[in-house]
């Protein structure tokens, strides 16, 4: 499997053209363009596992993926878009579990999650119950895969069962504008897949929101606190919402690890928060939190591909400054049709989070007219 690296500048230019065309009706300023590394940029990968008898009658294992068009499976020995640690561990893992039936029997998927700081979580997914024998062999596997300067975590998952050898997360360290930020990233939870592009996104967001220490920030869909932790130093206080329980726990850990004392996470959806802030409903989860104490002049949104729902869009429009990170330029453009009736676009960025795909990640900074 090879990458069309020589075509990367042209492919990126096509994305710029596509985003330019979508946003043209809103008269945006020139874009800030952030190109990706051309290989080994992806920090996580998922593979199905294929079992095949060799000539000796032994069970060989391969990583496989599926062609998105034909749906045909194909063998993957190396994945150039994945970082070097994943590629190294792909070969090492299969070698180390070969011939150990309790580790290979009914193994159907392997997930890898890595960090720039030299950690990897390997999740082994099974169509069987995990036993004490599996646990004993998984502990030995962790020892064999570990080496100086490399932290390896092994997680086993089966129906209604999850066993982590030591822990089920990696600890990432990102150098953002000269400051090291620490993030716990839990396996099987969302994290930004392109770590170096994530740094670009965080630094761009910091520049947009600079000199805001006299007001507060509201963030919807905060995940593990990726943006809110990086932006906390720019504001007096930060209030952030997240619905996923494991992400909230990670965010609380990350807040403590980074010594952030002005960031409050509440577990509720954007739709629920809209109801709360408008006084439509009261929530027990907000006991002890005085929403009126926050003077949020800036709102940060990073919605799913569907974009902002109508109620949230109406609520977002009430804030003087809007920072919008989008993973779908079509729904971004749709949302901007309403937002630009009251706000002007101050800055736009294209972050090439997913090279060699049609996917466009972008950021828009809006100021009330």
From Swiss-Prot:
Keywords: Methyltransferase, S-adenosyl-L-methionine, Transferase, tRNA processing
GO MF annotation terms: rRNA binding; tRNA (uracil(54)-C5)-methyltransferase activity, S-adenosyl methionine-dependent; tRNA binding
Keyword Methyltransferase (UniProt): yes
Gene3D superfamilies given in the database record: 2.40.50.1070, Vaccinia Virus protein VP39
One of the GO biological process terms: tRNA methylation
Positions of S-adenosyl-L-methionine binding: 192, 221, 226, 242, 302
Assigned GO CC terms: cytosol
Enzyme class: transferase
Catalysed reactions, semicolon-separated: uridine(54) in tRNA + S-adenosyl-L-methionine = 5-methyluridine(54) in tRNA + S-adenosyl-L-homocysteine + H(+); uridine(341) in tmRNA + S-adenosyl-L-methionine = 5-methyluridine(341) in tmRNA + S-adenosyl-L-homocysteine + H(+)
Entry annotation: catalytic residues: 327 (nucleophile), 361 (proton acceptor)
Domain of life of the organism encoding this protein: Bacteria
EC number: 2.1.1.-, 2.1.1.35
Functional summary from the UniProt entry: Dual-specificity methyltransferase that catalyzes the formation of 5-methyluridine at position 54 (m5U54) in all tRNAs, and that of position 341 (m5U341) in tmRNA (transfer-mRNA).
Stated family: Belongs to the class I-like SAM-binding methyltransferase superfamily. RNA M5U methyltransferase family. TrmA subfamily.
Stored PANTHER family: TRNA/TMRNA (URACIL-C(5))-METHYLTRANSFERASE (PTHR47790), TRNA_TMRNA (URACIL-C(5))-METHYLTRANSFERASE (PTHR47790:SF2)
Protein's recorded name: tRNA/tmRNA (uracil-C(5))-methyltransferase
Name of the encoding gene: trmA
């Amino acid at each position: 499997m090879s990458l069309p690296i020589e075509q990367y500048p042209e492919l990126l230019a096509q994305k710029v053209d596509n985003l330019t065309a979508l946003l043209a009706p809103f008269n945006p300023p020139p874009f800030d363009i952030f190109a990706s590394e051309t290989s080994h940029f992806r920090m996580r990968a998922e593979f199905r596992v294929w079992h095949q008898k060799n000539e000796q009658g032994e069970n060989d294992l391969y990583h496989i993926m599926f062609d998105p068009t034909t749906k045909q499976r194909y063998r993957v020995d190396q994945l150039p878009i994945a970082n070097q640690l994943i590629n190294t561990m792909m070969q090492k893992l299969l070698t180390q579990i070969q011939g150990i039936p309790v580790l290979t029997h009914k193994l159907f998927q392997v997930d890898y999650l890595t960090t720039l700081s030299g950690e990897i979580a390997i999740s082994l997914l099974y169509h069987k119950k995990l036993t004490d024998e599996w646990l004993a062999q998984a502990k030995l596997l962790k020892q064999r895969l570990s080496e100086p300067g490399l932290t390896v975590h092994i997680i086993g998952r089966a129906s209604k069962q999850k066993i982590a050898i030591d822990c089920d997360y990696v600890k990432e360290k990102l150098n953002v504008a000269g400051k090291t930020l620490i993030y716990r990233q839990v396996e099987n939870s969302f994290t930004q897949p392109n770590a170096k592009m994530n740094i670009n996104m965080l630094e761009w967001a910091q520049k947009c929101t600079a000199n805001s220490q006299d007001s507060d920030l509201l963030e919807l869909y905060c995940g593990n606190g990726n943006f809110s932790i990086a932006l906390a130093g720019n504001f007096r206080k930060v209030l952030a919402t997240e619905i996923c329980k494991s992400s909230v726990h990670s965010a609380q850990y990350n807040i403590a690890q980074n010594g952030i004392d002005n960031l409050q996470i509440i577990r509720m959806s954007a739709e629920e928060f809209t109801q709360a802030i408008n006084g439509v409903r009261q929530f027990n989860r907000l006991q002890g939190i005085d929403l009126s104490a926050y003077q949020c002049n800036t709102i940060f949104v990073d919605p799913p591909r569907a974009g902002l729902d109508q109620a949230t869009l109406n609520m977002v429009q009430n804030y003087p400054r809007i920072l919008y990170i989008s993973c779908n330029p079509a729904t971004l453009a749709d949302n901007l049709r309403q937002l630009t009736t009251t706000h002007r676009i101050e800055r736009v960025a294209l972050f090439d989070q997913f090279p060699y795909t049609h996917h466009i990640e972008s950021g828009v900074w809006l100021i009330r007219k």
